[in-house]
Amino acid sequence: MKQRLRQYIGEALQACFDQQQLHSGTIPEINLEVPAHAEHGDFSTNVAMAMARAEKKAPRKIAETIVAALGEGGGMWSRVEIAGPGFINFYLTPRCWFGVLDEVVRRGDLFGRTHTGNGRKVQVEFVSANPTGPLHIGHGRGAATGDAVAAVLGAAGYEVQREYYINDAGNQMLTLGRSLLLRYRELLGETIEFPTDCYQGVYVIDLAREVLESEGERLRDLPEEEALRFFANYGGDKIRAGIDEDLAAFGVRFDNWYSEQSLYDRQEVERGIALLKERGLTYEKDGAIWFRTTDYGDDKDRVLIRSNGATTYFASDVAYHKEKFERGFDTVIDVWGADHHGYVPRMKAVLAGLDRNPEDLQIILVQLVNLLRGGQQVAMSTRSGEFVTLREVIDEVGRDACRFFFLMRRSDSQLDFDLDLAKKQSTENPVYYVQYAHARVCSINRNAEDQGVAMPELGEVDFDCLTLEDELALTKLLSRYPEVVDGAAEHFEPHRVVFYLQELAARFHSYYNKGRVLVDDPDVSRARLYLVNCVRTVLHNALVLLGVSAPERM
């Protein structure tokens, strides 16, 4: 709708230039907003005010010239008014609005998909949990956020890759191996004083028991280094497989799994440091090699190579992000836990040091999740190794509720996840409320079939039969969906789609509760059936976009 309106305004401006009524010769960006009050029209533009300086005229005079050149817009609007200092307000005709329904029917599952991204390549890297333990609910929120960000970008016309970065280098894998080895020896009857810096969870004991069952006691006398390597590899492989299974149960699939160790195996870390050295961005102090990140806004410089010769995690992050852009991505998005917020400036510095625009790297921070049961917070303590896993929550409330609830707030705000509410089979449950709207339309369709009311085809509906205010309001809301998708993609905010779904479901339920869709007048029945099935299409498209099902019966 906005696109059509912009086209008419642009044509009117060009006509004004051609007829020497306006003289700047440049059409500015035409912003269209929905006024806060309905009496001010359906859309409003400030284009006249934007042109005032270049035209050296009062905005109202410019607005009068534009309005005179607009004509009737092919029946798109009933009237156009000038308000305040020079706003141009458009009042669209109901017939224009109801044309949106034909577009929904014409595009079907593709309605809401746009070409805004124009095929630009974007990588979204998310979850990337260490393969040292199962995924917890914090990882789950990151998974839902990253997957939904990738989905809305894809719907907006970007070429998207989903990547999981496997942190399989460094001390954490050795710590996992040691934890598993010690639990294995405990199971063999040895008395072990388990170190506090080892992984404490029950899952480590379970893995050790698996090793004992499959390998017996033969690993007891292995040399320490060989034993650690075996248990680290065994534990890492098993946990990685478990992570993959949990993500599959959550409906998340990655296009690429990228190993941190591979950066070392291919000397990418060395090459990354060498490049920074060549550019004069490093220096030596206290036997260590430092990157001058303060040159690019960081609060202090960062170590790349420690005085003992060991590289830092930051060094591998430099190499990893360098390699990402070498793969041809225009934009790279990292989804991190909010506790990594202090890491953002140094990664922006990396891009500047690599002669990339720091804005080519976008970082989405995901805040904590508070699980609630019976109104009380569920205890979670990673120190003791006992924590609520993502799989436990999926098993308790289901994938749909899990994904929807994780996306109900901005990712950078804390989230209270009410387990009791998520399990309710009632309209109190936000995801049930939205899915029920879809199921209700499907029920109407079954009733229509039973009554012999055929589903109208494109062009077979008399929109003059849609006379209720709620019918026009629903149609206006449907027209907004492509814009919601574009906004969610532009700002990396998939919660906008959730908010939209809740608004659309509420509007539909209100319409449904006020009267019948199928009435004695067949033309009215067919028009209403056409409308509610457009609602069903948009509900389906938006739910699927978020990885949530759209059930036909509930």
Curated annotation (Swiss-Prot):
Q: Does the record carry S-adenosyl-L-methionine as a key word?
A: no
> By its UniProt entry, which Gene3D superfamilies does this protein fall under?
Arginyl tRNA synthetase N-terminal domain (3.30.1360.70), HUPs (3.40.50.620), Isoleucyl-tRNA Synthetase, Domain 1 (1.10.730.10)
Compartment(s) where it occurs, according to its Swiss-Prot or TrEMBL record: Cytoplasm
Span(s) of short sequence motif 'HIGH' region? 129-139
Q: One GO molecular-function annotation for this sequence?
A: ATP binding
InterPro entries the UniProt entry points to: aa-tRNA-synth_I_CS (IPR001412), Arg-tRNA-ligase (IPR001278), Arg-tRNA-synth_N (IPR005148), Arg-tRNA-synth_N_sf (IPR036695), ArgRS_core (IPR035684), DALR_anticod-bd (IPR008909), Rossmann-like_a/b/a_fold (IPR014729), tRNAsynth_Ia_anticodon-bd (IPR009080)
Q: What class of enzyme is it?
A: ligase
Question: Which GO biological process categories is it annotated with?
Answer: arginyl-tRNA aminoacylation
Protein EC: 6.1.1.19
Q: What is its main location?
A: cytoplasm
Q: Which reaction does it catalyse?
A: tRNA(Arg) + L-arginine + ATP = L-arginyl-tRNA(Arg) + AMP + diphosphate
Entry's SMART domains? Arg_tRNA_synt_N (SM01016), DALR_1 (SM00836)
GO CC field: cytoplasm
Give a yes or no for keyword Transmembrane helix in this entry.
no
Q: Which UniProt keywords apply?
A: Aminoacyl-tRNA synthetase, ATP-binding, Cytoplasm, Ligase, Nucleotide-binding, Protein biosynthesis
Please indicate which superkingdom the organism of origin belongs to.
Bacteria
Q: Matching Pfam families, A to Z?
A: Arg_tRNA_synt_N, DALR_1, tRNA-synt_1d
The UniProt subunit note reads as follows:
Monomer.
- Please state which protein family the record places this protein in: Belongs to the class-I aminoacyl-tRNA synthetase family.
Give the protein's recorded name. Arginine--tRNA ligase
Q: Which organism is it from?
A: Syntrophotalea carbinolica (strain DSM 2380 / NBRC 103641 / GraBd1) (Pelobacter carbinolicus)
The lineage is: Bacteria, Pseudomonadati, Thermodesulfobacteriota, Desulfuromonadia, Desulfuromonadales
